[in-house]
Curated annotation (Swiss-Prot):
Organism classification: Eukaryota, Fungi, Dikarya, Ascomycota, Pezizomycotina
Basic and acidic residues: bias regions: 99-109, 120-129
Record organism: Gibberella moniliformis (strain M3125 / FGSC 7600) (Maize ear and stalk rot fungus)
Keywords, ordered alphabetically: DNA-binding, Metal-binding, Nucleus, Transcription, Transcription regulation, Zinc
Protein name, per record: Fusaric acid cluster transcription factor FUB12
Practical applications: Fusaric acid is phytotoxic to plants such as cotton and banana. It has been shown to induce programmed cell death in plants. In addition to a mild toxicity to animals, fusaric acid exhibits acanthamoebicidal, antioomycete, and antimycobacterial activities.
């Protein structure tokens, strides 16, 4: 039945409505008026609006008052605010084309329209850092300082000026005068086909968010939990941040949740969410600066099941760049509601900066010259109303807070040690002095975390902190006993050897404990990568001709136990990526019996003839010509294995044995 004409009662229309433009379908709004026939047939007449034209003004570029902007109805991003006009058009033109009718889902998917990118939180309205990034050019910085000084003087001489107009700031006006380039229709179509603007169904996304705050956030609390949940529930959360959260949390959700999101395994899910976040970032679909910083930090703690140029090093450098540009270090000095969040963010970056350098001294310290800030305390966490968010947030425990504080202290200890061993004239006495606080630090953890007898009451935070400390002690002592820093002191090498073996023993004990308690799947990526580093150290000891037969035999036994631990988490992307290389090395050196099920895991690494059968306990000895590891990773399979500096070669960090903190 033809629709009655409404053209007589509406203004003349000469273009398609926003939903039809987004879907690239024919629109009859010019004939029948609004809503058009397509929107009526899809039962979404409220979404049928025209995109706003940018009006020309005679004087100034911000003729619109804040009051008039507030009166503009929220039509899924079709009517752009001045702040939104500087954002990529793909975000602002996306309509909610989801077939779901759940109001919660409509709210969540409203973030596709660009409302998620408005930087209008109370914490970022009234100041440039961290709410607004600093200007990139010197003359703009000088002008900005001049404007700020003049504004401050005028404010002191008159009534306090309201901060409800962030668009009137000098920095915002610069963005209006020099808007970033807009994406064209081809880019929009490409991103839409990649489903960058889509999220899992709300009931599954809720599980993902909860898993993130239960298993990821406690070890890197870089979000304000209640602010995030409010923006997520209202549909105004940055998509880049949501995809990053989903990528990190995909390791901890149940298999049913993965299936509900359309993924068969964790590797596929994590790679998909990671790719969407990466595309969102690469196409400059910018969210607010804080969300982009937080998302980059989350992606910096993710290891995929395949090598990527955008690895943890890339995202860490990107995080430091964004934090410096936002002036987060200055925000840590203020005394307001946002100070706690920015102090935690800055300390997490500070810890990672030291650990990155400690892992490989070829890395440069990015924050070495940053001004010192006051150490974290338990008061640096927000007070939360848990009754309102009890379904998705768990209370923050004493152990969680102490965990991050302890990590900061640990980073300081190892930072002091590295400053000595990398100096021009390191001495054994000075190294002993700098490492001494480590033992007292470990002893104090149980009491500080208020640990109970039950494993669930904070024990995972205790074990994760201990694991990190023993891991980096192993790295340091290994390098000392191998003469990495040209230390000729024989007594120092013997001391390093003893501490190295003790740390290895403690790591073995911790790994066995989490296996017995069946909690290895609940521990963070930093713990998982420690297991791969531990296995590499055991392999090195087992094949080291300089070691005694007892040490080599014990190392072989430890290889078996560590492989059992990895087998429990072999569906984790980081482990799926590392296992094939480990299995080839172990098989070649007859350190680990491989069964038929094991050989299936390395089918992409070697070719097994069809007439060759393997029974349990049989050692697979593939010919070298069948190995197809990347060229950079093949050198350790041949020749003198001990001559290869297994944990130091930079190309081996493709496997991330020790490459993530």
């Amino acid at each position: 039945m033809p629709l009655p004409s409404r053209a007589s009662s509406t203004p003349k229309i000469s273009k398609a409505c926003v939903p039809c433009r987004t879907r690239k379908i024919k629109c009859n709004a010019a004939v029948v008026g609004l809503p058009c026939g397509s929107c009526v047939s899809r039962e979404c007449p409220d979404e049928c609006v025209l995109s706003a034209r940018k009006r020309r003004t005679v004087k100034g570029r911000n003729a619109e008052t804040p009051r008039s902007r507030k009166n503009i109805p929220d039509t899924n991003g079709s009517v752009l605010s001045p702040r939104q006009q500087q954002l990529p058009t793909n975000v602002s033109r996306q309509a909610t084309d989801s077939s779901h009718s759940d109001p919660v889902e409509e709210s969540i998917h409203a973030s596709h329209t660009g409302s998620s990118l408005r930087n209008d939180t109370p914490h970022s309205r009234d100041r440039r850092p961290p709410g607004q990034t600093q200007a990139d050019l010197l003359y703009l910085n000088i002008l900005q300082d001049t404007v700020n000084d003049t504004s401050a003087a005028q404010t002191d001489a008159s009534d306090h000026q309201s901060n409800d107009e962030p668009d009137d700031s000098f920095n915002s006006q610069i963005h209006h005068w020099n808007p970033p380039p807009q994406l064209d229709d081809v880019d929009n179509e490409y991103l839409a086909k990649k489903k960058v603007f889509e999220l899992p169904p709300p009931r599954f996304m809720e599980n993902i968010v909860k898993a993130y705050f239960d298993y990821v956030h406690p070890f890197a609390p870089i979000l304000n939990r209640t602010d995030f949940i409010q923006s997520y529930r209202s549909g105004s959360c940055c998509l880049f941040l949501l995809h990053a959260v989903a990528a990190a949390a995909s390791l901890y959700v149940t298999h049913d949740v993965l299936i509900g999101c359309g993924y068969q395994d964790r590797s596929t899910a994590q790679a998909s969410f990671f790719s969407k976040a990466k595309l969102f970032h690469d196409f400059h679909c910018q969210g607010d600066p804080l969300s982009m910083l937080q998302g980059s930090m989350i992606l910096g703690a993710i290891i995929l099941d395949h090598p990527s140029d955008r690895d943890f090093q890339y995202w860490f450098h990107n995080s430091v760049r964004r934090a410096s540009k936002m002036g987060v270090q200055n925000a840590c000095l203020r005394d307001d509601g946002s100070q706690k969040l920015y102090r935690r963010i800055w300390w997490v970056l500070h810890n990672r900066d030291i650990f990155h350098f400690f892992i490989n001294t070829q890395n440069m310290r990015l924050l070495a010259n940053a001004p010192p800030i006051r150490p974290l305390t338990e008061a640096d966490w927000e007070t939360e109303d848990m009754e309102q968010w009890s379904g998705i947030l768990s209370p923050i425990s004493q152990a969680q807070k102490v965990s991050l504080i302890a990590q900061c202290e640990l980073a300081q200890i190892f930072g002091n040690v590295m400053s000595v061993v990398t100096s021009s004239t390191p001495s054994a006495e000075e190294i002993h002095k700098r490492i001494l606080p480590l033992d007292a630090w470990r002893t104090s953890l149980p009491e500080r975390m208020q640990l109970m007898a039950s494993f669930a009451n904070g024990e995972k935070y205790h074990l994760e902190a201990l694991t990190t400390s023993y891991r980096f002690e192993c790295i340091m002592c290994r390098l000392l006993r191998r003469g990495r820093w040209q230390m000729s002191d024989g007594g120092l090498r013997e001391w390093a050897q003893q501490r190295f073996r003790s740390a290895i023993f403690e790591l073995d004990t911790i790994v066995k404990r989490v296996m017995i308690n069946n909690t290895i799947q609940k521990l963070p990526t930093t713990f998982i990568t420690t297991i791969t580093a531990l296995l590499a150290l055991h392999i090195e000891s087992a094949l080291d001709a300089a070691e005694s037969s007892l040490i080599r035999s014990m190392a072989r036994i430890s290889v078996q136990h560590t492989m059992l631990a990895l087998d429990q988490i072999r569906d984790t992307p980081a482990i799926k990526r590392a296992l094939p290389a480990f299995e080839i090395v172990l098989s070649k050196n007859k350190l680990y019996p491989m069964s038929t099920s094991d050989t299936e895991q390395i089918s992409t690494i070697q070719t097994i003839p069809q007439d060759q059968t393997l029974s349990d306990g049989q050692i697979l000895q593939p010919p070298p010509t069948d190995m197809t590891l990347p060229q950079d990773d093949q050198s350790f399979l041949y020749g003198d294995f001990i001559g290869f500096d297994f944990l130091d070669r930079w190309q081996m960090e493709q496997l991330d044995f020790t490459g993530i903190y």
